[in-house]
Amino acid sequence: MNTYRTGLFSEFLARMYLRCHGFRIVKSRYITGRNTGRAEIDIIAKRRNLLIFVEVKHRPTLSDGWDAITARQSVRLRNAAENYIAKNAWRGDARFDVIVVCGWRIHWARGAI
């Protein structure tokens, strides 16, 4: 399996994992335009009054997953999230999470970015 397909499969696993934890998937692979530095949010999910923006990483080890998120990427994700919140007039709470998939293990860090 190539890296693109592995990434798609990891995102699928992350969506199923979030659903099992009571979240409804609002959007997958949300891409912003030029004005926000072109960023992609892997998953946007909602539970009650909480909206989460999730970055999914597939890595052989957990530490590789955390290291894969750079400061520049964090800024882009925040800008993309602000774009989504403004566009959809979201009034509830919001949070940035990271899900790292290592083989078949899923590690979910809440409020990680």
Where are these regions (language model features)?
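Solvent-exposed beta-strand sheet faces enriched in polar/charged residues
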Residues: 29, 57, 97-99
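Conserved protein kinase catalytic core
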Residues: 33, 61, 103
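Conserved catalytic cores of phosphodiester-cleaving nucleases, focusing on short active-site segments
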Residues: 41-63, 77
